[in-house]
Amino acid sequence: MFDFEDGYSYPAKESIDMYNRYKENIALFGEMGFKTYRLSIAWSRIFPKGDEAEPNEAGLAFYEDLFKECHKHGIEPLVTITHFDCPMHLITEYGGWRNRKMLGFYENLCRTLFTRYKGLVKYWLTFNEINMILHAPFMGVGICFEEGENEEQVKYQAAHQELVASAMATKLAHEIDPENKVGCMLAAGKYNPNTAHPRDYWAAMQEDRSNYFFIDVQDRGEYPNYAKKQWERDGIKLEMTE
Protein backbone atom coordinates (compact mmCIF):
# COMPACT_ATOMS: atom_id res chain seq x y z
CA MET A 1 0.00 0.00 0.00
CA PHE A 2 2.99 2.32 0.35
CA ASP A 3 4.33 2.01 -3.20
CA PHE A 4 3.59 4.21 -6.21
CA GLU A 5 1.57 2.37 -8.84
CA ASP A 6 2.54 2.29 -12.51
CA GLY A 7 0.15 4.02 -14.87
CA TYR A 8 -0.87 6.73 -12.41
CA SER A 9 0.21 10.37 -12.31
CA TYR A 10 1.47 11.84 -9.05
CA PRO A 11 1.73 15.59 -9.74
CA ALA A 12 2.46 16.38 -6.08
CA LYS A 13 5.83 14.65 -6.49
CA GLU A 14 6.94 17.65 -8.55
CA SER A 15 4.31 20.27 -7.75
CA ILE A 16 5.73 23.77 -8.44
CA ASP A 17 9.30 22.40 -8.45
CA MET A 18 10.32 24.71 -5.60
CA TYR A 19 13.48 22.68 -5.04
CA ASN A 20 14.91 23.85 -8.35
CA ARG A 21 13.14 27.19 -8.73
CA TYR A 22 13.20 28.66 -5.23
CA LYS A 23 15.50 31.57 -6.11
CA GLU A 24 13.29 32.91 -8.87
CA ASN A 25 10.15 32.25 -6.81
CA ILE A 26 11.49 34.07 -3.75
CA ALA A 27 12.61 36.95 -5.97
CA LEU A 28 9.01 37.22 -7.18
CA PHE A 29 7.77 37.16 -3.58
CA GLY A 30 10.08 40.07 -2.81
CA GLU A 31 8.94 41.94 -5.90
CA MET A 32 5.34 41.59 -4.70
CA GLY A 33 6.25 42.97 -1.28
CA PHE A 34 5.91 39.78 0.74
CA LYS A 35 7.35 40.13 4.24
CA THR A 36 6.87 36.55 5.46
CA TYR A 37 7.16 33.19 3.73
CA ARG A 38 5.71 30.20 5.50
CA LEU A 39 7.36 26.97 4.38
CA SER A 40 7.87 23.46 5.70
CA ILE A 41 10.97 21.35 6.22
CA ALA A 42 10.89 17.92 4.55
CA TRP A 43 11.94 15.63 7.41
CA SER A 44 13.31 12.97 5.05
CA ARG A 45 15.46 15.56 3.30
CA ILE A 46 17.31 16.08 6.60
CA PHE A 47 17.12 12.51 7.95
CA PRO A 48 16.12 10.24 5.01
CA LYS A 49 15.04 7.33 7.20
CA GLY A 50 14.27 9.43 10.26
CA ASP A 51 16.31 7.48 12.80
CA GLU A 52 19.86 8.27 11.63
CA ALA A 53 22.33 9.79 14.06
CA GLU A 54 23.76 12.22 11.50
CA PRO A 55 21.81 14.48 9.12
CA ASN A 56 22.05 14.78 5.36
CA GLU A 57 24.31 17.76 4.70
CA ALA A 58 22.92 18.36 1.22
CA GLY A 59 19.43 18.82 2.68
CA LEU A 60 20.66 21.19 5.37
CA ALA A 61 22.61 23.23 2.82
CA PHE A 62 19.53 23.53 0.59
CA TYR A 63 17.41 25.07 3.32
CA GLU A 64 20.25 27.28 4.53
CA ASP A 65 20.57 28.78 1.06
CA LEU A 66 16.79 29.13 0.80
CA PHE A 67 16.61 31.04 4.09
CA LYS A 68 19.47 33.30 3.05
CA GLU A 69 17.64 33.97 -0.19
CA CYS A 70 14.56 34.99 1.81
CA HIS A 71 16.54 37.49 3.88
CA LYS A 72 18.19 38.82 0.72
CA HIS A 73 14.71 39.91 -0.40
CA GLY A 74 13.57 41.20 2.99
CA ILE A 75 11.40 38.16 3.73
CA GLU A 76 11.19 36.52 7.16
CA PRO A 77 10.89 32.71 6.99
CA LEU A 78 8.18 31.11 9.13
CA VAL A 79 9.15 27.45 9.26
CA THR A 80 7.00 24.40 9.97
CA ILE A 81 9.24 21.63 11.29
CA THR A 82 7.15 18.77 9.91
CA HIS A 83 4.16 18.91 7.58
CA PHE A 84 2.42 15.54 7.13
CA ASP A 85 5.71 13.97 6.04
CA CYS A 86 6.76 11.40 8.62
CA PRO A 87 9.56 9.39 6.94
CA MET A 88 8.20 6.10 5.60
CA HIS A 89 10.85 4.13 7.49
CA LEU A 90 9.49 5.48 10.79
CA ILE A 91 6.01 4.30 9.79
CA THR A 92 6.95 0.80 8.66
CA GLU A 93 9.54 0.10 11.36
CA TYR A 94 8.13 1.95 14.38
CA GLY A 95 4.43 2.44 13.66
CA GLY A 96 4.62 6.21 13.33
CA TRP A 97 3.59 8.41 16.24
CA ARG A 98 1.90 5.57 18.10
CA ASN A 99 5.48 4.78 19.20
CA ARG A 100 7.07 6.89 21.94
CA LYS A 101 10.47 6.46 20.27
CA MET A 102 9.29 9.10 17.81
CA LEU A 103 9.98 11.73 20.46
CA GLY A 104 13.70 11.05 20.26
CA PHE A 105 13.76 11.09 16.46
CA TYR A 106 11.80 14.35 16.39
CA GLU A 107 14.00 15.92 19.05
CA ASN A 108 17.06 15.06 16.98
CA LEU A 109 15.48 16.76 13.98
CA CYS A 110 14.61 19.86 16.00
CA ARG A 111 18.03 20.15 17.60
CA THR A 112 19.65 19.89 14.18
CA LEU A 113 17.40 22.58 12.68
CA PHE A 114 17.56 25.02 15.59
CA THR A 115 21.34 24.77 15.74
CA ARG A 116 22.01 24.98 12.01
CA TYR A 117 19.61 27.84 11.32
CA LYS A 118 20.24 29.95 14.39
CA GLY A 119 20.16 33.55 13.22
CA LEU A 120 18.43 32.64 9.97
CA VAL A 121 15.08 31.44 11.33
CA LYS A 122 13.39 32.65 14.49
CA TYR A 123 9.73 31.80 13.82
CA TRP A 124 8.85 28.11 14.07
CA LEU A 125 5.74 25.91 14.03
CA THR A 126 6.20 22.48 15.58
CA PHE A 127 3.57 20.54 13.58
CA ASN A 128 1.30 21.40 10.70
CA GLU A 129 -2.38 21.11 11.62
CA ILE A 130 -1.72 18.92 14.65
CA ASN A 131 -5.43 18.20 15.15
CA MET A 132 -5.55 16.26 11.87
CA ILE A 133 -4.44 13.31 13.99
CA LEU A 134 -8.12 12.81 14.77
CA HIS A 135 -9.41 13.26 11.22
CA ALA A 136 -6.71 11.79 8.94
CA PRO A 137 -4.42 9.73 11.18
CA PHE A 138 -2.19 8.28 8.47
CA MET A 139 -1.56 11.68 6.93
CA GLY A 140 -1.24 13.36 10.31
CA VAL A 141 0.87 10.90 12.29
CA GLY A 142 1.67 7.95 10.04
CA ILE A 143 -0.69 5.50 11.74
CA CYS A 144 -2.08 2.34 10.16
CA PHE A 145 -4.67 0.72 12.40
CA GLU A 146 -4.60 -2.95 13.28
CA GLU A 147 -7.77 -4.97 13.10
CA GLY A 148 -9.84 -4.82 16.26
CA GLU A 149 -7.88 -2.12 18.09
CA ASN A 150 -9.48 0.93 19.68
CA GLU A 151 -8.77 3.56 17.05
CA GLU A 152 -9.63 6.51 19.30
CA GLN A 153 -7.21 5.20 21.93
CA VAL A 154 -4.44 4.97 19.32
CA LYS A 155 -5.15 8.44 17.93
CA TYR A 156 -5.15 10.16 21.31
CA GLN A 157 -2.01 8.30 22.38
CA ALA A 158 -0.31 9.55 19.21
CA ALA A 159 -1.66 13.02 19.97
CA HIS A 160 -0.12 12.82 23.43
CA GLN A 161 3.21 11.87 21.86
CA GLU A 162 3.11 14.86 19.50
CA LEU A 163 2.04 17.28 22.22
CA VAL A 164 4.96 16.18 24.40
CA ALA A 165 7.25 16.49 21.38
CA SER A 166 5.96 19.99 20.73
CA ALA A 167 6.72 21.00 24.32
CA MET A 168 10.20 19.48 24.08
CA ALA A 169 10.82 21.36 20.83
CA THR A 170 9.69 24.66 22.33
CA LYS A 171 11.99 24.27 25.34
CA LEU A 172 14.89 23.27 23.11
CA ALA A 173 14.32 26.17 20.71
CA HIS A 174 14.56 28.71 23.52
CA GLU A 175 17.64 27.05 24.98
CA ILE A 176 19.49 27.18 21.66
CA ASP A 177 18.36 30.70 20.77
CA PRO A 178 16.36 32.86 23.20
CA GLU A 179 15.18 34.89 20.20
CA ASN A 180 13.23 31.94 18.81
CA LYS A 181 9.45 32.17 18.73
CA VAL A 182 7.57 28.86 18.61
CA GLY A 183 3.90 28.39 17.90
CA CYS A 184 1.33 25.76 17.00
CA MET A 185 -0.82 25.42 13.91
CA LEU A 186 -4.39 24.16 13.78
CA ALA A 187 -6.77 23.16 10.99
CA ALA A 188 -10.04 24.49 12.32
CA GLY A 189 -12.97 26.73 11.75
CA LYS A 190 -15.55 27.97 14.21
CA TYR A 191 -18.63 25.78 14.58
CA ASN A 192 -21.89 27.71 14.81
CA PRO A 193 -25.15 26.35 16.20
CA ASN A 194 -27.86 25.67 13.64
CA THR A 195 -30.54 27.20 15.86
CA ALA A 196 -30.80 29.00 19.18
CA HIS A 197 -31.78 25.75 20.88
CA PRO A 198 -29.41 24.80 23.75
CA ARG A 199 -28.94 21.38 22.16
CA ASP A 200 -27.42 22.99 19.06
CA TYR A 201 -25.21 25.29 21.13
CA TRP A 202 -23.93 22.28 23.06
CA ALA A 203 -23.24 20.35 19.86
CA ALA A 204 -21.29 23.29 18.39
CA MET A 205 -19.24 23.64 21.57
CA GLN A 206 -18.42 19.93 21.56
CA GLU A 207 -17.20 20.14 17.97
CA ASP A 208 -15.07 23.19 18.79
CA ARG A 209 -13.51 21.37 21.72
CA SER A 210 -12.32 18.51 19.50
CA ASN A 211 -10.10 21.03 17.72
CA TYR A 212 -9.34 23.58 20.44
CA PHE A 213 -8.19 20.76 22.73
CA PHE A 214 -4.82 20.88 20.97
CA ILE A 215 -4.45 24.61 21.58
CA ASP A 216 -5.57 24.34 25.20
CA VAL A 217 -2.86 21.79 25.99
CA GLN A 218 -0.06 23.72 24.30
CA ASP A 219 -1.11 27.03 25.83
CA ARG A 220 -1.85 25.85 29.38
CA GLY A 221 0.50 22.89 29.69
CA GLU A 222 -2.12 20.44 30.91
CA TYR A 223 -5.07 18.46 29.65
CA PRO A 224 -8.44 20.22 30.03
CA ASN A 225 -11.03 18.59 32.24
CA TYR A 226 -13.49 18.20 29.36
CA ALA A 227 -10.95 15.99 27.54
CA LYS A 228 -10.30 13.85 30.61
CA LYS A 229 -14.03 13.34 31.12
CA GLN A 230 -14.52 12.40 27.49
CA TRP A 231 -11.69 9.86 27.64
CA GLU A 232 -13.20 8.40 30.80
CA ARG A 233 -16.55 7.98 29.05
CA ASP A 234 -14.89 6.42 25.99
CA GLY A 235 -12.59 4.09 27.92
CA ILE A 236 -9.42 5.83 26.72
CA LYS A 237 -6.40 5.56 29.01
CA LEU A 238 -3.26 7.36 27.91
CA GLU A 239 0.15 6.00 28.79
CA MET A 240 2.14 8.89 30.25
CA THR A 241 5.76 8.50 31.33
CA GLU A 242 8.47 10.93 32.34
Please provide the spans of the model-predicted regions.
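N-terminal structural segment of carbohydrate-active enzymes
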Residues: M1-N56, L60, L66-K72
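Active-site region of glycoside hydrolase catalytic domains
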Residues: M1, D6, G50-D51, A61-E242
